[in-house]
Every structure is written in C-alpha cells, then in structure tokens.
Amino acid sequence: VKEILIKNNKTTGIKTSDGVEIKSDLIVANSDAEYIYNQLISKNVSAARSERRKLKLATKSLSGFSLLLGLDNSKGKAVSIDHHNVYFPSNYDSEFDDIFTKQVPVKDPTIYICAPKDPLMTKGGNKEAWFVLVNAPRHQVDGGWDWRHGGAEYAQKIIQKLDHLGLNVSPRLDFMKYRTPADL
C-alpha cells in the first residue's frame, strides 16, 4: 500500500505501489500509527492533522529485535523445547531501564522463542526453524539508539545468551537473519 485514499475526511480506498486503486469505505491498517499518518495519509487531509500533532508529542514505546534461525541438528545436540518459550532475565526491571532510561540494547533481555515442530517449516527432517524476539529500544537517530549500526554484534550476543541458557544454538546454526527496529 502506497497511500490510503481519503475524500471529504472519509476513506475511499487504497492505492498500491504499482498505481492500482482499490475502493473501500473501511481500511484496517496494522502498522505503526506514525507511519500511517505521516506516510500513507496525504498531508492535505484535515482530519489527520490533530493525530499527527498528538503523535509528534507522544512518548514513543519500545520496539523489537528479531532473529530468524535455521538450525541443523546433525551439527550438534538438539534440545527439546516447546513451540512457545519465554526466558526471563534475573533482573527483569533492568531490561526496561536499558530500553526507556538508557535507550540502549538490553544487556540481559527477556527472550521469546517460537520453535514450531511442523516439518513444512524446515528444509529437512533434522532441521529446525526458530523465531527469536527480544525487547529493544526504538530506532531513534537523534537522542536515542541508532539501529543502523551494531545489529550483527547484538545478534551474536543473543546467540551467546541462547547458548548460555543451554540451547546449543552456535554449533547448530545453519542460517541467521536479524531484523532491528530500524528495519521495521
């Protein structure tokens, strides 16, 4: 979607990046509100102006740093974990101090892992595909954390933490892709 179309302060549809217009009187946007109001809705829409002002003044929330991991169990001992897993740090409060006060990547983050057992999610019988998510400060170039730098190093720290938790990721790691808050 390139634009949410609005006429007389009512939605009329969307325009795609290839110029196709799809008519609709209802639009559901599951995206960041700032992106919607500043990128998808024309600056000429008067009904959106007050929302833009509110968003500009609002304190921004946290974000996420994710890893997509492909694991090859022929390279190391597999561990048995559930489909959904959450590993909490010893000092949960410090996670939010890092995010909101210091505005730095979390030193000891809560880690969520989705490890589906569906064979259609992997390349073979001895493989696993994990989605790993940790809380992170939002991408903010001025006065916050600039996620255009340091993503690979932070991904390695998370892998080390997974190993420390006994999940034996490093020796089995066959594929890794990470996404920072700047990518979202």
Named regions from a protein language model:
Residues 2-124:
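Mid-domain catalytic core of redox enzymes
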Residues 72-184:
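C-terminal segments that line or cap access tunnels to active or ligand-binding sites in enzymes
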